[in-house]
């Protein structure tokens, strides 16, 4: 069977969005074929019929949540609908509620997207051997905020076992150095670990952590390896109440994969 998909560049985190309806039990295999055929693709999402009144449902390859893919899907829906500016509502795997993405066309096939990200279900400190590191838990994915105390080789060695320890569907190790971020993400169901060019949920996790640590609202611009993501984390009476992520997405082209 042939499956059509769009290759999209959201701040360098190259994403495939499959528009042909695919059964859930086939999605991991299809994602693997797409990523093997084009090694620049870092993740795959599938468009499905929404359960509610959203424009579409985005189901990620491992059932995880992804902010960059959400902006990508919203940009694709806007482009296909001829919308230059407006709001696109999505259902997204790993998110308990529909997400509203505000899109604005920048030029042909490129959109700026701002999305109200899900709030973390918890921010805590976890022990990993001799290391004690902050963990920001979202529905569908958890992120560990790392510094130079964790080596790259140790990250690559331990990410799978740490994901299991945290009982997470997916795990990001976010190497944060000032305003620079280097994300490493593992998805349990597909057993894939990728040094991503940018990570929206990981950037959001860092902003949430920094705001909680400061006890005050924060607006941060994080330089991911291939672009900047801006996040506004708002606190009211010391409680995190809003996370707004802004990034761009370029629709690069449409492709086919045969299974």
Language model segments and positions:
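Membrane helix-loop-helix hairpins that form the core translocation module of multi-pass transporters
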Residues: 110-118
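A glycine-rich beta-to-alpha transition motif near the start of alpha/beta enzyme domains, typified by
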Residues: 1-111, 125-127, 134-137, 142-259
């Amino acid at each position: 069977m042939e499956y059509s998909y769009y290759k999209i560049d959201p701040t360098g985190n190259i994403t495939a969005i499959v528009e042909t309806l695919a059964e859930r039990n086939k999605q991991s295999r299809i994602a693997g074929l797409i990523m093997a055929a084009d090694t620049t693709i870092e993740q795959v999402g599938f468009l499905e019929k929404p359960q509610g009144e959203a424009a579409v449902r985005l189901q990620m390859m491992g059932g995880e949540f992804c902010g960059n893919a959400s902006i990508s899907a919203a940009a694709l829906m806007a482009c296909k609908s001829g919308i230059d500016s407006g709001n696109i509502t999505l259902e997204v795997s790993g998110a308990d509620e529909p997400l509203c993405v505000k899109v604005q066309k920048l030029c042909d096939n490129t959109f700026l997207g701002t999305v109200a990200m899900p709030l973390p279900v918890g921010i805590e400190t976890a022990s990993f051997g001799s290391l004690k590191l902050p963990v920001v838990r979202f529905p569908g994915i958890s992120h560990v905020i790392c510094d130079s105390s964790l080596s790259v080789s140790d990250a690559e060695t331990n990410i799978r076992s740490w994901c299991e320890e945290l009982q997470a569907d997916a795990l990001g190790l976010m190497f944060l150095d000032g305003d620079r971020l280097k994300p490493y993400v593992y998805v349990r169901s597909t057993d894939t670990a990728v040094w991503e060019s940018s990570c929206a949920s990981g950037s959001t996790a860092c902003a949430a952590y920094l705001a909680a640590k400061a006890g005050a609202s924060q607006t941060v611009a994080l330089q991911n390896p291939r672009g900047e993501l801006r996040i506004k984390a708002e606190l009211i009476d010391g409680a995190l109440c809003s996370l707004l992520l802004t990034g761009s997405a370029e629709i690069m082209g449409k492709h086919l994969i045969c299974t």
